[in-house]
Amino acid sequence: MELKIAQIQMPVTADREENIRCACDMVRQAGDIDMAVLPEMFCCPYDNACFRPYGEAEGGPAYRALSALARERGIWLVGGTLPELAEDRVYNTCYVFAPDGQLAAKHRKMHLFDIDVAGGQRFMESETLTAGNSVTTFETPWGVVGVCVCFDFRFTELSELMVLAGAKLVVVPAAFNMTTGPAHWELLFRQRAVDGQCYTVGTSPARDTAAGYVAWGHSIVCDPW
């Protein structure tokens, strides 16, 4: 059974409301689709200084906009990620909405992006974010779908657990950068697809070379071959 997926490789600016509008507009422009996938931190600059100020509790404005959009379009919507505020903590959270607008799954990024590459990128998510602790899958008419976030995907065991739970498709909102992207983006998505004998989808923000954090782009779909 055919599954039409739109990857929303959108620009992310400092204007939170405009980012939400842009995401919704691009999903509408995708036309006749079954599923849309937004990128990591789709409504927030990828910057530790921004995560808490741009954050919202579950059920906040961005959550409601995505729920309404899924219902309006009658699609499965993997809502990228946004900073979720909960009990004075901040999580990098992906909400998944069913075609009726109901929450189908929620994944908090488990493996925080803490790297310091000599001559390259330094970023420490753990300075502001708290890690999640769950493996996330959800049922669709096309079968089980797994979801994780960016750095999660580097850890083979997490992908294996999703596949063991029945996932034939693993969807990954991600924001690899100009250091990690050229080295590992395509490699990881092809490797996980072959190892797990599943399809993999990686959705990135658009590249903005003027941003403080420059995303690699190159949203990708890989088959098990």
Region locations from a protein language model:
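Short beta-strand segments enriched in small/hydrophobic residues
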Residues: M1-P11
